[in-house]
């Protein structure tokens, strides 16, 4: 059993390290940087323990493998040391009109002429499900926008 946060509040960032497009990116995931995320991760472990120790699953489980019998600060350390993400990386160039937005409602990048973005990076928040369906919608909408703009 594996529990995880579907809507983490922590936010990472990706930065350019130079002007050359081949320069490596600086990726700062900032997992668990928001205090609510650690609380939610602890709740995930507790829920997995309850389910795993339930009467329905007792015939199929011998013991908890990880994190074992950890509690308190030791459990928090385990969570911090073993945190992973299973989400597709999204929301790095969100659509909107606030100061953190990168593209407008027509997928145009603010301040850069003739550049649009049409992928999962424009989503303002991570979806609770797989990202494929929203990406299909974004692509379909991009096609409609381009056809209208170019009178096709």
Describe each PLM feature range.
Residues 1-134, 142-152:
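FAD-dependent oxidoreductase catalytic-site/capping-region signature
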């Amino acid at each position: 059993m594996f529990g995880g946060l579907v809507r983490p509040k922590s936010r990472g960032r990706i930065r350019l390290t130079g002007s050359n497009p081949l320069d490596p990116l600086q990726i700062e995931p900032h997992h668990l940087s928001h205090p609510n995320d650690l609380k939610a991760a602890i709740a995930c472990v507790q829920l997995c323990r309850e389910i795993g120790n339930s009467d329905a699953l007792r015939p199929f489980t011998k013991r908890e493998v990880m994190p074992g019998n950890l509690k308190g600060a030791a459990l928090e350390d385990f969570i911090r040391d073993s945190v992973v993400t299973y989400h597709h990386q999204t929301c790095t160039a969100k659509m909107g009109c606030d100061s953190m937005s990168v593209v407008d409602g027509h997928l145009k990048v603010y301040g850069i002429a003739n550049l649009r973005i049409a992928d999962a990076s424009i989503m303002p928040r991570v979806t609770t499900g797989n990202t494929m369906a929203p990406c299909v919608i974004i692509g379909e909408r991009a096609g409609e926008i381009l056809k209208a703009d170019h009178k096709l």
